[in-house]
Amino acid sequence: MATTTVQNFADHLEIQQVLNLYASALDKHQWSDLEQVFTEDAVADFIGIGVCEGRQAITELVTGVLTQCAVTQHLLGNYMIDVDGDKATASCYLSAMHAGLGDYAAEIFTVWGEYNDQLVRTADGWRIAHRSLTTMHASGDIGLNGQLIKS
């Protein structure tokens, strides 16, 4: 097991806060908060949805999908974080619920998955440089026309 130092502990907390800020920004539609989550040149591979290159492209993808939902809730847990100087890897489980709109108002689309991230320490704090989402299970249909993985 790695030696725990005050800096290592602080890094772990800061990284977990970045991961949590992502989920909170999605659910509250606070898209500008994603500037505090991703590097400008970040890459996100939402397996089954597509690969986005750049923070702007990532923001446009999640905005386009989530504004078609009445409400969402992205819950994260089982954080595993490994810090190596100014780089880190992190993984966490995702349980995400998406409520439909209009004809789909009574429907829920649920995703269980795992985020795997590569982070870098910047002058402004930790940021995700690469994110991948692997879906373990998905169920439901809220009329997103294939924009989210369906099982």
Regions found by a protein language model. Name each.
Residues M1-K28, S32, Q36, E40:
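Short, low-complexity N-terminal intrinsically disordered segments enriched in polar/charged residues
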Residues T3, T67-S151:
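A beta-strand edge to alpha-helix "cap/lid" segment located at domain peripheries
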